Amino acid sequence: MHCVLAVGGIHLGHCLRDDHDVTAKTWFHYGKAIERLKFYLSRWKVAKPDDLLRLLISTVLLQDFEAIRGNVDGEVFQHLRASRQIASALFNSTLNNDTEIMGVALEAYCYRELISAFRLGVEEADIQQVLNSFVIDLSCLQHLPTFGSCFWYCSFLFMQIPLISQLAGRRQRELREGVDMCCDVEYTHLYNKISSWRPPGQEFSANCEVDIEDSEAVSAMIVRISLLLFLVTSFYHKSITPHELCKITQPWVTEALSLLQFAHGSPTIIALFWPMIVIGSYAREVSDQSVLQRMLSTSTHKMPIVAKGLVLLECLWRS
Protein backbone atom coordinates (compact mmCIF):
# COMPACT_ATOMS: atom_id res chain seq x y z
CA MET A 1 0.00 0.00 0.00
CA HIS A 2 2.86 2.39 0.77
CA CYS A 3 4.23 1.77 -2.75
CA VAL A 4 0.87 2.51 -4.36
CA LEU A 5 0.44 5.74 -2.39
CA ALA A 6 4.00 6.83 -3.20
CA VAL A 7 3.47 6.31 -6.95
CA GLY A 8 0.17 8.21 -6.85
CA GLY A 9 1.76 10.97 -4.83
CA ILE A 10 4.75 11.56 -7.11
CA HIS A 11 2.44 11.95 -10.09
CA LEU A 12 0.01 14.21 -8.24
CA GLY A 13 2.85 16.23 -6.74
CA HIS A 14 4.13 17.13 -10.21
CA CYS A 15 0.70 18.51 -11.13
CA LEU A 16 0.36 20.35 -7.79
CA ARG A 17 3.89 21.74 -7.55
CA ASP A 18 3.23 24.02 -4.57
CA ASP A 19 1.33 21.50 -2.45
CA HIS A 20 3.93 20.74 0.22
CA ASP A 21 1.52 18.47 2.07
CA VAL A 22 1.26 16.11 -0.92
CA THR A 23 5.05 16.13 -1.31
CA ALA A 24 5.61 15.36 2.37
CA LYS A 25 3.12 12.51 2.37
CA THR A 26 4.56 11.10 -0.86
CA TRP A 27 8.04 10.87 0.60
CA PHE A 28 6.68 9.51 3.86
CA HIS A 29 5.08 6.60 2.02
CA TYR A 30 8.18 6.12 -0.12
CA GLY A 31 10.35 5.94 2.98
CA LYS A 32 8.02 3.43 4.62
CA ALA A 33 7.97 1.32 1.45
CA ILE A 34 11.77 1.21 1.31
CA GLU A 35 11.97 0.38 5.00
CA ARG A 36 9.56 -2.55 4.69
CA LEU A 37 11.11 -3.71 1.44
CA LYS A 38 14.60 -3.90 2.95
CA PHE A 39 13.24 -6.05 5.76
CA TYR A 40 11.51 -8.54 3.45
CA LEU A 41 14.31 -8.62 0.87
CA SER A 42 16.66 -9.90 3.55
CA ARG A 43 14.33 -12.90 3.92
CA TRP A 44 13.16 -13.46 0.34
CA LYS A 45 14.89 -16.85 -0.05
CA VAL A 46 12.57 -18.41 2.50
CA ALA A 47 9.49 -16.52 1.31
CA LYS A 48 6.43 -18.34 0.01
CA PRO A 49 5.36 -17.80 -3.62
CA ASP A 50 2.53 -15.45 -2.58
CA ASP A 51 5.03 -13.32 -0.66
CA LEU A 52 7.41 -13.33 -3.64
CA LEU A 53 4.61 -11.96 -5.78
CA ARG A 54 4.01 -9.13 -3.30
CA LEU A 55 7.73 -8.36 -3.28
CA LEU A 56 7.90 -8.25 -7.07
CA ILE A 57 4.87 -5.96 -7.27
CA SER A 58 6.49 -3.67 -4.69
CA THR A 59 9.80 -3.43 -6.54
CA VAL A 60 8.02 -2.82 -9.86
CA LEU A 61 5.96 -0.02 -8.29
CA LEU A 62 9.11 1.57 -6.87
CA GLN A 63 10.64 1.43 -10.35
CA ASP A 64 7.54 3.28 -11.55
CA PHE A 65 8.02 5.85 -8.80
CA GLU A 66 11.61 6.58 -9.80
CA ALA A 67 10.82 6.49 -13.53
CA ILE A 68 7.95 8.98 -13.20
CA ARG A 69 10.23 11.15 -11.08
CA GLY A 70 12.82 11.14 -13.85
CA ASN A 71 15.27 8.55 -12.49
CA VAL A 72 17.21 11.44 -10.95
CA ASP A 73 19.83 9.33 -9.17
CA GLY A 74 19.58 6.16 -11.23
CA GLU A 75 17.50 4.45 -8.56
CA VAL A 76 15.42 2.62 -11.16
CA PHE A 77 18.38 0.34 -11.80
CA GLN A 78 18.79 -0.39 -8.09
CA HIS A 79 15.15 -1.45 -7.78
CA LEU A 80 15.51 -3.43 -11.00
CA ARG A 81 18.46 -5.38 -9.64
CA ALA A 82 16.44 -6.10 -6.51
CA SER A 83 13.69 -7.55 -8.72
CA ARG A 84 15.79 -10.00 -10.70
CA GLN A 85 16.16 -12.95 -8.38
CA ILE A 86 12.65 -12.46 -7.03
CA ALA A 87 11.16 -12.53 -10.54
CA SER A 88 13.20 -15.60 -11.45
CA ALA A 89 12.18 -17.43 -8.28
CA LEU A 90 8.55 -16.48 -8.82
CA PHE A 91 8.65 -17.61 -12.46
CA ASN A 92 9.99 -21.01 -11.37
CA SER A 93 7.69 -21.33 -8.36
CA THR A 94 4.63 -23.53 -7.95
CA LEU A 95 2.35 -20.50 -7.76
CA ASN A 96 -0.43 -20.58 -10.35
CA ASN A 97 1.03 -18.21 -12.94
CA ASP A 98 -2.18 -18.05 -14.92
CA THR A 99 -3.55 -15.39 -12.58
CA GLU A 100 -3.85 -11.86 -13.95
CA ILE A 101 -1.83 -10.21 -11.20
CA MET A 102 1.00 -12.71 -11.70
CA GLY A 103 1.04 -12.11 -15.45
CA VAL A 104 1.02 -8.33 -15.15
CA ALA A 105 3.79 -8.33 -12.53
CA LEU A 106 6.10 -10.61 -14.54
CA GLU A 107 5.52 -8.78 -17.81
CA ALA A 108 6.02 -5.38 -16.18
CA TYR A 109 9.32 -6.59 -14.73
CA CYS A 110 10.45 -7.98 -18.12
CA TYR A 111 9.51 -4.74 -19.87
CA ARG A 112 11.58 -2.65 -17.47
CA GLU A 113 14.49 -5.07 -17.62
CA LEU A 114 14.62 -4.92 -21.41
CA ILE A 115 14.08 -1.15 -21.63
CA SER A 116 16.91 -0.58 -19.14
CA ALA A 117 19.33 -2.03 -21.73
CA PHE A 118 18.15 0.48 -24.36
CA ARG A 119 21.36 2.55 -24.09
CA LEU A 120 25.08 2.43 -24.71
CA GLY A 121 27.45 1.55 -21.89
CA VAL A 122 25.34 -1.06 -20.11
CA GLU A 123 27.48 -3.10 -17.73
CA GLU A 124 28.36 -6.52 -19.11
CA ALA A 125 27.19 -8.19 -15.89
CA ASP A 126 23.72 -6.67 -16.29
CA ILE A 127 23.49 -7.85 -19.91
CA GLN A 128 24.53 -11.37 -18.97
CA GLN A 129 21.92 -11.44 -16.20
CA VAL A 130 19.23 -10.78 -18.79
CA LEU A 131 20.63 -13.13 -21.43
CA ASN A 132 20.77 -15.97 -18.90
CA SER A 133 17.23 -15.46 -17.61
CA PHE A 134 13.70 -16.16 -18.83
CA VAL A 135 13.44 -12.51 -19.90
CA ILE A 136 15.30 -13.14 -23.16
CA ASP A 137 12.56 -15.53 -24.36
CA LEU A 138 9.19 -13.90 -23.78
CA SER A 139 7.40 -16.80 -25.45
CA CYS A 140 7.43 -18.43 -22.03
CA LEU A 141 4.93 -15.79 -20.89
CA GLN A 142 2.66 -15.78 -23.92
CA HIS A 143 0.26 -18.28 -22.38
CA LEU A 144 -0.62 -15.75 -19.68
CA PRO A 145 -4.07 -14.17 -20.16
CA THR A 146 -2.68 -10.66 -19.69
CA PHE A 147 0.34 -11.00 -21.98
CA GLY A 148 0.73 -7.98 -24.23
CA SER A 149 -0.22 -5.37 -21.63
CA CYS A 150 3.31 -3.93 -21.91
CA PHE A 151 4.64 -5.36 -25.16
CA TRP A 152 1.47 -5.37 -27.34
CA TYR A 153 2.47 -7.71 -30.17
CA CYS A 154 6.04 -6.50 -30.61
CA SER A 155 7.68 -8.57 -27.88
CA PHE A 156 10.08 -9.88 -30.55
CA LEU A 157 11.53 -6.39 -30.95
CA PHE A 158 12.04 -5.88 -27.24
CA MET A 159 13.93 -9.17 -27.01
CA GLN A 160 16.55 -7.79 -29.42
CA ILE A 161 17.52 -4.91 -27.10
CA PRO A 162 19.98 -6.79 -24.84
CA LEU A 163 21.49 -8.45 -27.93
CA ILE A 164 22.17 -5.01 -29.40
CA SER A 165 23.65 -3.82 -26.09
CA GLN A 166 25.91 -6.86 -26.02
CA LEU A 167 27.01 -6.13 -29.60
CA ALA A 168 27.76 -2.51 -28.66
CA GLY A 169 30.14 -3.57 -25.90
CA ARG A 170 31.86 -6.17 -28.07
CA ARG A 171 32.17 -3.74 -30.98
CA GLN A 172 33.95 -1.18 -28.80
CA ARG A 173 36.41 -3.86 -27.67
CA GLU A 174 36.91 -4.87 -31.30
CA LEU A 175 37.77 -1.29 -32.29
CA ARG A 176 39.91 -0.71 -29.21
CA GLU A 177 41.93 -3.94 -29.44
CA GLY A 178 42.01 -4.28 -33.22
CA VAL A 179 40.91 -7.92 -33.02
CA ASP A 180 38.17 -9.31 -35.27
CA MET A 181 35.27 -10.41 -33.05
CA CYS A 182 32.85 -11.01 -35.94
CA CYS A 183 30.77 -7.98 -34.96
CA ASP A 184 29.93 -7.32 -38.60
CA VAL A 185 28.30 -10.75 -38.87
CA GLU A 186 26.23 -10.20 -35.73
CA TYR A 187 25.30 -6.68 -36.87
CA THR A 188 24.06 -7.96 -40.23
CA HIS A 189 22.09 -10.73 -38.55
CA LEU A 190 20.36 -8.34 -36.13
CA TYR A 191 19.78 -5.74 -38.83
CA ASN A 192 18.06 -8.25 -41.10
CA LYS A 193 15.88 -9.58 -38.27
CA ILE A 194 14.72 -6.15 -37.13
CA SER A 195 14.36 -4.45 -40.52
CA SER A 196 12.28 -7.33 -41.93
CA TRP A 197 9.92 -7.48 -38.94
CA ARG A 198 6.34 -6.32 -39.45
CA PRO A 199 3.30 -6.31 -37.14
CA PRO A 200 1.44 -9.63 -37.46
CA GLY A 201 -1.65 -9.70 -39.63
CA GLN A 202 -0.88 -6.43 -41.38
CA GLU A 203 -1.70 -5.90 -45.05
CA PHE A 204 0.93 -3.86 -46.84
CA SER A 205 0.71 -1.91 -50.04
CA ALA A 206 3.47 -0.48 -52.18
CA ASN A 207 3.04 2.95 -50.62
CA CYS A 208 2.33 2.13 -46.98
CA GLU A 209 4.12 -0.23 -44.60
CA VAL A 210 1.49 -0.23 -41.89
CA ASP A 211 -2.23 0.31 -41.35
CA ILE A 212 -2.32 3.83 -39.88
CA GLU A 213 -5.72 3.13 -38.31
CA ASP A 214 -4.10 0.50 -36.05
CA SER A 215 -2.36 2.54 -33.33
CA GLU A 216 -0.59 -0.51 -31.91
CA ALA A 217 0.83 -1.40 -35.33
CA VAL A 218 1.97 2.19 -35.87
CA SER A 219 3.59 2.27 -32.43
CA ALA A 220 5.28 -1.07 -33.06
CA MET A 221 6.83 0.28 -36.26
CA ILE A 222 8.13 3.30 -34.32
CA VAL A 223 9.73 0.94 -31.80
CA ARG A 224 11.27 -0.94 -34.73
CA ILE A 225 12.82 2.26 -36.09
CA SER A 226 14.24 3.20 -32.68
CA LEU A 227 15.90 -0.23 -32.48
CA LEU A 228 17.42 0.21 -35.93
CA LEU A 229 18.84 3.57 -34.83
CA PHE A 230 20.21 1.98 -31.66
CA LEU A 231 21.70 -0.91 -33.66
CA VAL A 232 23.40 1.32 -36.24
CA THR A 233 24.90 3.48 -33.49
CA SER A 234 26.06 0.43 -31.54
CA PHE A 235 28.02 -0.75 -34.56
CA TYR A 236 29.27 2.50 -36.11
CA HIS A 237 29.86 4.50 -32.90
CA LYS A 238 33.39 5.97 -33.01
CA SER A 239 34.14 4.36 -36.39
CA ILE A 240 32.47 7.03 -38.56
CA THR A 241 31.83 10.76 -38.10
CA PRO A 242 28.58 12.08 -36.58
CA HIS A 243 27.76 13.64 -39.97
CA GLU A 244 28.13 10.27 -41.71
CA LEU A 245 25.98 8.61 -39.05
CA CYS A 246 23.24 11.22 -39.52
CA LYS A 247 23.19 10.57 -43.27
CA ILE A 248 22.43 6.92 -42.51
CA THR A 249 19.78 7.62 -39.89
CA GLN A 250 17.88 10.59 -41.39
CA PRO A 251 15.48 8.46 -43.52
CA TRP A 252 14.44 6.57 -40.38
CA VAL A 253 13.93 9.81 -38.45
CA THR A 254 11.69 11.10 -41.24
CA GLU A 255 9.68 7.87 -41.31
CA ALA A 256 9.34 7.79 -37.51
CA LEU A 257 8.10 11.38 -37.31
CA SER A 258 5.52 10.64 -39.98
CA LEU A 259 4.26 7.65 -37.99
CA LEU A 260 4.30 9.62 -34.72
CA GLN A 261 1.72 11.99 -36.18
CA PHE A 262 -0.72 9.04 -36.27
CA ALA A 263 0.30 7.64 -32.85
CA HIS A 264 0.10 11.01 -31.07
CA GLY A 265 -2.99 11.03 -28.86
CA SER A 266 -3.46 7.26 -28.98
CA PRO A 267 -3.35 5.08 -25.82
CA THR A 268 -0.02 3.60 -26.92
CA ILE A 269 1.83 6.94 -27.03
CA ILE A 270 2.88 6.62 -23.36
CA ALA A 271 4.87 3.48 -24.24
CA LEU A 272 6.72 5.41 -26.95
CA PHE A 273 8.53 7.78 -24.61
CA TRP A 274 11.94 6.10 -24.84
CA PRO A 275 11.66 5.46 -28.60
CA MET A 276 10.80 9.16 -29.02
CA ILE A 277 13.89 10.18 -27.05
CA VAL A 278 16.07 7.85 -29.13
CA ILE A 279 14.58 9.16 -32.38
CA GLY A 280 14.84 12.76 -31.16
CA SER A 281 18.55 12.37 -30.42
CA TYR A 282 19.09 11.84 -34.17
CA ALA A 283 16.86 14.74 -35.28
CA ARG A 284 19.18 17.35 -36.80
CA GLU A 285 16.66 19.27 -38.88
CA VAL A 286 15.03 22.17 -37.00
CA SER A 287 11.63 21.19 -38.41
CA ASP A 288 12.02 17.64 -37.04
CA GLN A 289 13.08 18.96 -33.65
CA SER A 290 10.05 21.26 -33.56
CA VAL A 291 7.69 18.35 -34.16
CA LEU A 292 9.12 16.36 -31.24
CA GLN A 293 9.28 19.42 -29.02
CA ARG A 294 5.60 20.12 -29.64
CA MET A 295 4.59 16.50 -28.99
CA LEU A 296 6.46 16.26 -25.70
CA SER A 297 5.51 19.72 -24.42
CA THR A 298 1.80 19.18 -25.16
CA SER A 299 1.69 15.60 -23.90
CA THR A 300 -1.31 14.83 -21.70
CA HIS A 301 1.00 12.67 -19.56
CA LYS A 302 2.20 15.35 -17.15
CA MET A 303 5.15 13.64 -15.49
CA PRO A 304 8.65 14.81 -14.52
CA ILE A 305 10.25 12.21 -16.79
CA VAL A 306 8.57 13.72 -19.87
CA ALA A 307 9.80 17.20 -18.96
CA LYS A 308 13.32 15.87 -18.28
CA GLY A 309 13.32 14.00 -21.58
CA LEU A 310 12.54 17.22 -23.44
CA VAL A 311 15.30 19.07 -21.56
CA LEU A 312 17.74 16.30 -22.53
CA LEU A 313 16.80 16.55 -26.20
CA GLU A 314 17.07 20.34 -26.20
CA CYS A 315 20.59 20.05 -24.77
CA LEU A 316 21.52 17.60 -27.54
CA TRP A 317 20.03 19.83 -30.22
CA ARG A 318 22.03 22.83 -28.99
CA SER A 319 25.32 20.91 -28.95
What is each model feature region?
Residues 300-319:
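C-terminal, low-complexity intrinsically disordered regions in eukaryotic proteins
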Residues 16-22, 121-297, 301, 313:
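Cytosolic regulatory protein-protein interaction regions
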Residues 2, 56, 102-103, 107, ...:
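Start-of-helix signal in alpha-solenoid helical-repeat scaffolds, especially tetratricopeptide repeats
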Residues 3-22, 28-73, 83-89, 107-117, ...:
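Hydrophobic/aromatic-rich effector regions of fungal transcription factors
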Residues 60-169:
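Acidic/serine-rich, low-complexity amphipathic helices located in mid- to C-terminal regulatory regions
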Residues 21-25, 29, 75-82, 101, ...:
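Short acidic-hydrophobic sequence patches enriched in Asp/Glu that either
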Residues 94-101, 215, 307-312:
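Acidic, Ser/Thr-rich low-complexity linear motifs
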